[in-house]
């Protein structure tokens, strides 16, 4: 059974409360439960992790290489400025799919650039929680191609 790590960054623990007009009413717990169920139907074991701390996310990315076949990552606001997370992704050999609930390219100009996307296998934005499922499908396809 393939193992995948789902990492959600800062403020995503506030889903369902924070800016529901942008992120929707669903909670992180709902998202994680739905993703685990979807992964199970695909024969994938999914572990979920959320942190508001850059170092904790970096540590988890480093550890993932020896445990998981791939990572689905929503770096939150770190997307736009964390060269440390970018370098952590670049330092591992497993594929990472970047996902965002909202379309970062339609929002404030400071959100348009992702410093992490260039070292990811791909980026999925703007499809709400469904984007996470798309990321899982894409990751599984990437692993089949390898």
From Swiss-Prot:
Pathway assigned in UniProt: Metabolic intermediate biosynthesis; chorismate biosynthesis; chorismate from D-erythrose 4-phosphate and phosphoenolpyruvate: step 3/7
Reaction(s) catalysed by this chain's protein: 3-dehydroquinate = 3-dehydroshikimate + H2O
Sites marked Transition state stabilizer: 18
Source domain of life: Bacteria
Single Gene Ontology BP annotation: aromatic amino acid family biosynthetic process
Pfam families linked: DHquinase_II
Keyword Signal: no
InterPro entries: DHquinase_II, DHquinase_II_CS, DHquinase_II_sf
Gene Ontology MF terms: 3-dehydroquinate dehydratase activity
Protein residues bound to substrate: 74, 80, 87, 101-102, 111
Function per UniProt: Catalyzes a trans-dehydration via an enolate intermediate.
UniProt xrefs under NCBIfam families: aroQ (TIGR01088), PRK05395.1-2 (NF003805), PRK05395.1-3 (NF003806), PRK05395.1-4 (NF003807)
Subunit architecture: Homododecamer.
Sequence similarity: Belongs to the type-II 3-dehydroquinase family.
Protein name listed in UniProt: 3-dehydroquinate dehydratase
Lineage: Bacteria, Bacillati, Bacillota, Bacilli, Bacillales
Gene that this sequence comes from: aroQ
